[in-house]
């Protein structure tokens, strides 16, 4: 089967039936201007409405006081601003907040991580995940569907609404967004890219492209396409120093091996300004699986031609997982080897693990609709991005 990369189009402008309303959260600025053009309005109306939507977290047309009453009435007839609702909130002792967010009859999870100098939101891109990484709780839930643009950017909107809109508080509620929640973002490009465009847009959330990070496990055809679509920071879920280990814990490696993956990564960062010439390597530490000093030496040799910084992630356990968490001493020895080679190496501080909000622990509530044949194809054959 040949790879098919799905790119953003104007599908969001299509109303499924005459009684349905267009959810304006599904539209990036280009699509929003097309929407107002079709209403017979000037393009600047799109900018006005987006400013209300994202700077004030406003979802009521009647509150948009610089828009005339007639147009507000028209908007109420054909459009809505409907973000997914929070159905459960958990707060960690370290300040981390995890929200379970309803998307249809299921849930995804979004995590807010406040720090002294920043506030990061971890956003989901799919209901579940089809890649079956063995150390990840989300992967064990199976896969159901891709999230729509409104369900992705809606997580950011809802979090900002709860924490406090910038125009209301005077403080930016979210400084960084990481596409590291449930799902593989590159298997949902047609929705993830427009959502990230809204994150970057001055009339959207206005984030710097260096503060929006997409993390991928290695869907190479989509990564090759991504650089022509948008420029954001890139993090890669490597987790192994060789193909033998990675084949076992990250099954997509059987299709796109480490060499192929890193070649694609170098191609992306060579034309990216957001990455400042280097990529973030994510490496989960699994006890006596990939955490020996011999693995550290091997990883250093592997990455010698890839400008990068390395995040070592203490593994966060979940019920039934076949792994153990590396000891602090093993992580420390691993880190020291990498630093001796000159790599910037950071041991990620675990946040929110007491509420299962830490890396690899997000599970949501997923009805698994992944066909077994599709899973096997993803491990050993070409991936049809459109089919997932």
From Swiss-Prot:
Its EC number is 2.1.1.192. SUPFAM superfamilies: Radical SAM enzymes. One of its GO terms (biological process) is rRNA base methylation. S-adenosyl-L-methionine binds at residues 183-184, 215, 237-239, 316. It catalyses: adenosine(2503) in 23S rRNA + 2 reduced [2Fe-2S]-[ferredoxin] + 2 S-adenosyl-L-methionine = 2-methyladenosine(2503) in 23S rRNA + 5'-deoxyadenosine + L-methionine + 2 oxidized [2Fe-2S]-[ferredoxin] + S-adenosyl-L-homocysteine; adenosine(37) in tRNA + 2 reduced [2Fe-2S]-[ferredoxin] + 2 S-adenosyl-L-methionine = 2-methyladenosine(37) in tRNA + 5'-deoxyadenosine + L-methionine + 2 oxidized [2Fe-2S]-[ferredoxin] + S-adenosyl-L-homocysteine. Its cofactor is [4Fe-4S] cluster. Residues 115-354 form the Radical SAM core domain. Disulfide bonds join 122-359. PANTHER family: 23S RRNA METHYLTRANSFERASE (PTHR30544), RADICAL SAM CORE DOMAIN-CONTAINING PROTEIN (PTHR30544:SF5). This is Dual-specificity RNA methyltransferase RlmN. The gene is rlmN.
């Amino acid at each position: 089967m040949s790879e098919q990369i799905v790119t953003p189009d104007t599908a969001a402008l299509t109303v499924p039936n005459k009684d349905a309303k267009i959810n304006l959260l599904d539209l990036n600025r280009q699509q929003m201007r097309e929407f107002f053009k079709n209403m017979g309005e000037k393009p600047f109306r799109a900018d006005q409405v987006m400013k209300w939507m994202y700077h004030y977290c406003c979802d009521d047309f009647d509150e948009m006081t610089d828009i005339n009453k007639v147009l507000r009435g028209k908007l109420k007839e054909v459009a809505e601003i409907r973000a997914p609702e929070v159905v459960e909130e958990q707060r960690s002792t370290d300040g981390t907040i995890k929200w379970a967010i309803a998307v249809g009859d299921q849930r995804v999870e979004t995590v807010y991580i406040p720090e002294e100098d920043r506030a990061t939101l971890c956003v989901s891109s799919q209901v579940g995940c089809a890649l079956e990484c063995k150390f990840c709780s989300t992967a064990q839930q199976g896969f159901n569907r891709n999230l729509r643009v409104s369900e992705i950017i809606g997580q950011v909107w809802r979090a900002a609404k709860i924490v406090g809109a910038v125009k209301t508080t005077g403080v930016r509620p979210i400084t960084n967004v990481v596409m590291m929640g449930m799902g593989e973002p590159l298997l949902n490009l047609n929705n993830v890219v427009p959502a990230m465009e809204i994150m970057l847009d001055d009339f959207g959330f206005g984030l710097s492209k260096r503060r929006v990070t997409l993390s991928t496990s290695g869907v190479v055809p989509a990564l090759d396409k991504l650089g022509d679509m948008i420029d954001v920071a890139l993090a890669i879920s490597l987790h192994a120093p060789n193909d033998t280990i990675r084949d076992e814990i990250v099954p997509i490696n059987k299709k796109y091996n480490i060499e192929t993956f890193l070649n694609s990564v170098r191609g992306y960062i060579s034309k990216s300004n957001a990455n400042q010439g280097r990529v973030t390597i994510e490496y989960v530490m699994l006890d006596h699986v990939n955490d020996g000093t011999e693995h550290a030496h091997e990883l250093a040799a592997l990455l010698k031609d890839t400008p990068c910084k390395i995040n070592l992630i203490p593994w966060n356990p979940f019920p039934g997982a076949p792994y153990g968490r590396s000891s602090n001493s093993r992580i420390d020895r691993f880190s020291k080897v990498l630093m001796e080679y000159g790599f910037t190496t950071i041991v990620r501080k675990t946040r929110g693990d007491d509420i299962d909000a830490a890396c690899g622990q997000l599970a949501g509530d997923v009805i698994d609709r992944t066909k077994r044949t599709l899973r096997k194809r993803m491990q050993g054959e070409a991936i049809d991005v459109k089919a997932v």
